[in-house]
């Protein structure tokens, strides 16, 4: 399953400038997802992070991974939100920032459900630029119906 930016905007509760997923290139709902964030110089966070040396803040890379993870569990096989589930993030574990992300990079976000118990779900997340691992983390979320 794939999703364009309009489907992403309908499925996520976020809006600009905090919407950090541009499209979904692959998804098996409830199992795994591959999404894309095109990092442009016009991102508002580059104004102060850092003047003359713009670097995407690591916490925003993790947020992009969290948004992709949310799409994985709230969308059906047609790429539309099921509308009956909200996702609240509970913790970020084992976050590692391996390389910087700069304007012009295409951030590929990969997330897989690695464990479910009750209404909680743990995701194994990785972000890549040109097939190079830049960030990894485990995200724990609670799903409310």
Curated annotation (Swiss-Prot):
Keywords: Cytoplasm, Lipid A biosynthesis, Lipid biosynthesis, Lipid metabolism, Lyase. One of its GO terms (cellular component) is membrane. It is an enzyme of class 4 (lyase). InterPro entries: FabA_FabZ, FabZ, HotDog_dom_sf. Its EC number is 4.2.1.59. It catalyses: a (3R)-hydroxyacyl-[ACP] = a (2E)-enoyl-[ACP] + H2O. Pfam families: FabA. Its main location: cytoplasm. The active site is at residue 49. GO terms for molecular function: (3R)-hydroxyacyl-[acyl-carrier-protein] dehydratase activity. It is found in: Cytoplasm. GO terms for biological process: fatty acid biosynthetic process; lipid A biosynthetic process. Belongs to the thioester dehydratase family. FabZ subfamily. HAMAP family: FabZ. Involved in unsaturated fatty acids biosynthesis. Catalyzes the dehydration of short chain beta-hydroxyacyl-ACPs and long chain saturated and unsaturated beta-hydroxyacyl-ACPs. PANTHER family: 3-HYDROXYACYL-[ACYL-CARRIER-PROTEIN] DEHYDRATASE. This is 3-hydroxyacyl-[acyl-carrier-protein] dehydratase FabZ. It comes from Anaplasma phagocytophilum (strain HZ).
């Amino acid at each position: 399953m794939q999703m364009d930016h309009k489907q992403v905007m309908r499925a996520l509760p976020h809006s600009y400038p905090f919407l950090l997923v541009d499209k979904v290139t692959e998804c098996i709902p409830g199992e795994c997802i591959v999404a894309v964030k095109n990092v442009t110089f016009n991102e508002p966070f580059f104004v102060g992070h850092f003047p003359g040396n713009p670097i995407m803040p690591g916490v925003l890379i993790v947020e992009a991974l969290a948004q992709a993870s949310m799409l994985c569990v709230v969308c059906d096989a047609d790429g539309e939100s099921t509308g009956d589930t909200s996702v609240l993030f509970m913790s970020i574990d084992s976050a590692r920032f391996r390389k910087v992300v700069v304007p012009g990079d295409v951030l590929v976000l990969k997330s897989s459900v690695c464990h479910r118990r009750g209404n909680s779900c743990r995701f194994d997340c990785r972000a890549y630029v040109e097939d190079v691992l830049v960030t990894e983390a485990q995200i724990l979320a609670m799903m409310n119906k």
